Curated annotation (Swiss-Prot):
Residues 698-852, 892-951, 1050-1077 form a coiled coil. It comes from Xenopus laevis (African clawed frog). WD repeats lie at residues 33-74, 75-116, 117-157, 158-200, 201-248, 249-296, 297-334. It is found in: Cytoplasm, Cytoskeleton, Microtubule organizing center, Centrosome; Cytoplasm, Cytoskeleton, Microtubule organizing center, Centrosome, Centriolar satellite; Cytoplasm, Cytoskeleton, Cilium basal body. One of its GO terms (cellular component) is ciliary basal body. PROSITE patterns: TBC_RABGAP, WD_REPEATS_1, WD_REPEATS_2, WD_REPEATS_REGION. SMART domains: WD40 (SM00320). Residues 355-383 are annotated as: Disordered. This is TBC1 domain family member 31.
């Protein structure tokens, strides 16, 4: 094993001697990167990725260095220094020198490996990018992180769409399916969705496995044809999904050493049609095992417990595997060396002949070489476990010989002693027949009958009408070659009418005509044999191309190279573009002479289906330049011109296609075996739509007749035209003489006309000058008039502007004055209203204070009356006749109280109604003159002062009356107390009042009297507070608890109403004066509350 240290070199050789990988390890070279300044430190490689061809790969280390390794040229180059560790690399973009690198700062950068420069910088991820998937066209990329996946356009490097998921779900991987526009997204909950990359609409979802079969997917791999998905995770089982049926069709169980799967990779094979059978499984032990998913056998493995594999990348051509090892180095493996043991031929089978008549015993006694072989049972949907077998047994199946030996010998026997199998063996050995004997071998293989008489009869019919003008359509330099081609095509057209209508027949027959131009019979029969055998079913859809044959070619291409067919479909290229041009010329346009001869050595030596296989082989062998074609014109040019091609590889590929194509699509199933031409007379060729050919023949005959008629008419026309020319010449001479006479006359007349024209011209000039002078004069007058009109218009505009300014100034002044007056009036009104509200508030406060005093006094009197009543009724408990009276008095007092309260409520409602009615009749706000308003306000103040004096006089009078009433009440209270004390002394025994209770009662009564006296003194001191509420004293003779409330507000309300009426009258007077003085002022109605 070779080891290469990159050191500080930026370029160099990968290996220094020719690598010879062993079959055990298969390592071509081990690449390490040791820092020269610190020998103990080595740079660790992190990621690696191959290009689309599979011969170059990129590798990035943890310092941000990206190296490109070219395994064909044995060279490495340092293409970029990113200064950051890379987390993912992709190297299969549509521009072959560009690559994508995902860095540790969550960004993705695009670099050019050739120019070693930055192309674009893509941001958008919030966490590290774990994978990059490129579309088959190389123009789109999907980058995946743990929380999001983003779709990028690699032409503009703009983000097209973004896939977000809940944090609880998370994304495992998002990638493109090969050969399709489908994006597969795999999430951490084992759900897998397929999306259309153009519209990003969900196409389908794979069913989530049941709990007992869940693997918690972490690794995924897809086959090249995009039909099978392998998934693995935290288990030793692998799930294989069929994406066509969207079902889990197989579960593979790995060995017991495998506990979890870290990475999955399919190993491509050039001959599996994209359905890869070898799957690489990287497990937790660092060993990557490659297994056959059909037989569940271990093919080979890489890595070991001492130096584990971290990640691996498989080349698209299946030749190399690049692995990043645990120690940071890079191993390059040769798949051919690793699978050499697998590709060895089986050991020779030694059998013993048993003379026993029993066939079964003979089979059982035969000795078999002992070869270690593990048989594994694989069933759909179940884990695959190996059978426990003892000695492996190889059973031999004896086939009964069929009675076909004679027929096969007859078929293989050729004239002149040649044998077809021997010719085929020689052809496989040398690749071609000897040039000296090629024509002889071809004649033998084609078994030409050499029917001289039949061919002469065809030649005697002459040149076919369809090919009389062949030299115009195909200008061939050699007259002999043109003549032979014309005769051969005419003979074919006379043999079968279809060949007179076939446009491509000259292209098909020309290479054989050029090859057999010295023997026209052989040339005709070779072309006829090719048409009858290798052009089977070509004319069934005439005049259209053979759709059935082209369908066979397309089916073969779809099976063996689906990617190339999809490329054709994507660019609108069908089989009539990539297959029919080759068939209709029999490869003569795309191959050189020597290549064409080698190809037809093999075509004539095999079944007629080999020609179709050769077409498919040519297309597949040219897949690389075809995949680079993007325009339909490029494809058409490619299939009509010669291209660089290894004919040997193409022929080998054709034989491979013959052997590996399934029977259902193999052309051999639909094409008949080789049948030579019959001797004596040529066979009838009528495998074409006869009515179409007959119709075209009739149409051609009709056209020929019309052409003959046209020629006769043209002959007559020419004769008439000759006579007409003769007469025309005579007429022309006479006309010339007449023209000379007319010329002389015209010359004289022209002189007269010139003079007249000169005179007329002078008059016209004079009239023109006069008209111009008149026009100038009119223009000057019009300009003067317009200037004067503009002057007048400007003067009027200025006058109008002055008037408008004056009007605007006066209106503005009037509006300002009006607004000032209105504001003054509003302010005065607001002041009056505020003053009125202030007075009302003062009155309400005073009224509230009086009401509170009266409430306190009433409460004291009520409590005192209750005590007295309680004491009195205690004294009168023995008199039962007073109980009824007490009840009646209580009821009467309650009725009187309710009556008084009802009257009070009625009065308040009436007052409120009156106030509302008066408020609704208030007049509009008007402007008042300042002096009148002040005078009226002084009058109003005087009236208010008079009313205030009168009111205070009334208040003093009522206070005097209140004092008298209080004194009278105090005297009556003293009498009642004295009376009660005397009664208590007289009847101390029956009442049985304890001393303590009596003392308590008198103390309470004394407290109530004292509080009432204090209130009386305080009310008498405050002489400025009006007393609007009065209490009627309870009569001494009345022993009931009833007392009457007289609010005493009637006189105050009447005074207030009189004051308000005077204010209204005053406002009416002011409003009438204002209307008389300013009749044009109008104010909006304003209601004040």
């Amino acid at each position: 094993m070779q080891t290469t240290d990159l050191g500080n070199k930026e370029y160099g050789k990968i290996w220094h001697r020719k690598p010879s990988p062993s079959t055990n390890e298969g390592i071509i070279v081990n690449i390490v990167h040791v820092d020269a300044s610190h020998l103990s430190k080595s740079t660790r490689f992190l990621q690696a990725a191959f290009d689309s061809a599979g011969d170059c790969f990129l590798a990035g280390d943890h310092l941000g260095n990206v190296y490109m390794f070219n395994l064909n040229r044995n060279r490495f180059d340092l293409v970029q220094k990113t200064m950051q560790a890379c987390t993912a690399i992709a190297f299969n973009l549509h521009r072959k020198t560009e690559f994508l690198v995902a860095l540790a700062d969550n960004s993705v950068k695009c670099f050019d490996a050739g120019a070693k420069e930055l192309v674009s910088w893509m941001r958008g991820h919030e966490s590290a990018v774990t994978s990059i998937s490129i579309h088959a066209s190389g123009r789109y990329a999907v980058t995946t992180s743990s929380d999001t996946a983003q779709l990028w356009d690699l032409d503009t490097f703009q983000r097209k769409r973004k896939l977000n998921v809940r944090q609880s779900v998370g994304i495992q991987k998002v990638f493109f399916l090969p050969l399709s526009n489908t994006i597969l997204s795999c999430f951490k909950d084992d759900s897998i969705f397929a999306w259309e990359s153009d519209t990003l609409a969900c196409k389908y979802q794979l069913p989530i496995p049941e709990d007992e079969t869940k693997l918690h997917y972490k690794a995924f791999a897809i086959t090249r044809d995009g039909r099978m998905l392998a998934a693995g995770g935290k288990s030793k089982n692998l799930h294989l999904w069929c994406l066509d049926s969207k079902q889990l069709f197989r579960i593979i169980q790995m060995p017991a050493k495998v506990r979890s799967v870290q990475q999955l990779e399919f190993l491509p094979d050039n001959f599996d049609g994209g359905s890869s059978q070898i799957l690489g499984v990287l497990s937790q032990d660092g060993i990557m095992r490659f297994i056959n998913i059909q037989t569940c056998k271990l093919v080979f493995d890489i890595g070991n417990p001492d130096n584990r594999v971290v990640t691996s990348s498989v080349s698209p051509n299946g030749r190399y595997i690049t692995s990043v090892m645990e120690n940071g180095s890079l191993n390059i493996y040769s798949v051919q060396a690793l699978s050499k043991e697998l590709n060895k031929p089986p050991p020779p089978l030694v059998k013993m002949v048993d003379l026993s008549k029993d066939k079964d015993s003979t089979g059982n006694k035969s000795g078999v070489s002992r070869a270690s072989q593990e048989k594994v049972r694989v069933s759909s949907g179940r884990t695959c476990r190996p059978w426990k077998t003892k000695d492996p047994i190889v059973r031999t199946k004896y086939l009964r010989p069929e009675d076909t030996t004679a027929s096969e010998d007859k078929e293989n026997a050729l004239p002149a002693g040649l044998n077809k199998p021997r010719l085929q063996a020689m052809l496989k050995g040398f690749g071609e027949y000897p040039a000296k004997y090629r024509m002889f071998i071809w004649r033998s293989l084609l078994q030409l009958p050499e029917n001289h008489a039949a061919f002469s009869s065809l030649l005697d019919k002459g040149t076919h009408s369809q090919y009389k003008l062949l030299h115009q359509e195909y200008p061939i330099k050699s007259r002999k070659l043109l003549r032979v081609l014309q005769r051969t095509l005419s003979a074919l057209a006379h043999w079968s009418a279809i060949f007179g209508e076939t446009k491509y027949l000259p292209l098909l027959a020309f290479p054989f005509v050029k090859l057999f131009q010295n023997n026209q019979l052989i040339c005709f029969e070779v072309v006829a044999t090719v048409i009858t055998n290798w052009c089977q079913h070509w004319f069934e859809y005439f005049p259209n191309p053979p759709i059935n044959i082209l369908g066979m070619v397309e089916n073969l291409l779809a099976h063996h190279d689906k990617e190339l067919l999809q490329h054709f479909i994507n660019h609108g290229v069908n089989s009539q573009v990539y297959a029919w041009p080759i068939l209709e010329t029999l490869f003569s346009e795309v191959l050189t002479r020597e290549e064409w001869l080698r190809l037809f050595d093999n075509v004539f030596s095999n079944h007629p289906s080999f020609l179709l296989m050769a077409v498919v082989s040519y297309i597949i062998s040219s897949r690389s330049p075809l995949l680079h074609c993007n325009q339909k014109d490029d494809f058409e040019y490619f299939f009509h011109h010669r291209n660089n091609l290894d004919i040997s590889n193409m022929i080998r590929e054709a034989y491979h296609l013959m052997d590996t194509s399934p029977a259902e699509i193999h052309p051999q199933r639909l094409l008949s075996d080789f049948e030579p031409l019959t001797r004596g007379q040529y066979p009838i060729f009528n495998k074409y739509p006869k009515f179409i050919v007959d119709y075209q023949g009739q149409e051609r005959e009709r056209i020929r007749q019309e052409e003959m008629e046209y020629l006769r008419e043209r002959q007559l026309t020419q004769e008439v035209e000759a006579e007409a020319v003769k007469r025309r010449l005579e007429d022309q001479a006479w006309y010339q003489q007449q023209e000379l006479l007319k010329g002389a006359e015209e010359q004289r007349r022209k002189l007269l006309m010139d003079e007249e024209q000169k005179l007329l011209h002078q008059r016209q000039r004079l009239a023109t000058v006069k008209r111009e002078l008149r026009l100038k004069e009119l223009q000057l007058l019009d300009a003067a008039r317009r200037r004067f009109l503009r002057y007048q218009q400007d003067q009027r505009k200025m006058e109008l502007r002055r008037l408008d300014d004056e009007i605007e100034r006066k209106v503005s002044l009037r509006e300002q004055e009006t607004a000032t007056i209105v504001k003054d009036v509003e302010i005065r009104q607001m002041e009056l209203e505020a003053q009125r509200r202030f007075f009302e508030q003062q009155l309400a406060k005073e009224q509230e204070a009086v009401t509170q005093d009266m409430k306190g006094e009433l409460d004291a009197n009520r409590r005192r009356a209750d005590l007295e009543e309680q004491m009195f009724w205690r004294l009168m408990e023995t008199e039962e006749d007073l109980k009824d009276q007490k009840l009646l008095e209580e009821s009467l007092a309650k009725a009187e109280r309710l009556c008084v309260e009802t009257d009070w409520k009625i009065q308040s409602l009436q007052k409120q109604k009156c106030d509302d009615w008066e408020r609704g009749k208030r007049y509009e706000e008007i402007s008042k003159l300042t002096e009148d308003v002040q005078e009226k306000e002084r009058e109003l103040c005087n009236v208010l002062k008079d009313m205030e004096t009168r009111k205070w006089a009334e208040v003093s009078q009522k206070m005097t009356e209140l004092e008298r009433e209080k004194l009278a009440g105090s005297a009556q209270q003293a009498q009642r107390q004295q009376f009660l004390q005397e009664k208590l002394r007289q009847e101390a025994g029956p009442i049985d009042i304890s001393g303590e209770d009596g003392n308590e009662y008198f103390e309470r009564l004394r407290d109530l009297n004292r509080s009432s006296m204090q209130k009386d003194f305080s009310s008498s001191d405050e002489q400025h507070v009006p007393e609007n509420v009065c209490l009627n004293d309870v009569s001494a003779s009345d022993s009931s608890t009833h007392f009457s409330l007289d609010r005493g507000r009637g006189e105050l309300e009447r005074g207030e109403r009189a004051l308000i009426s005077e204010v209204r009258e005053l406002r009416q007077k002011l409003a009438s004066q204002a209307h008389k003085k300013y009749p044009h002022l109008h104010f909006s109605q304003t209601s004040w509350s």
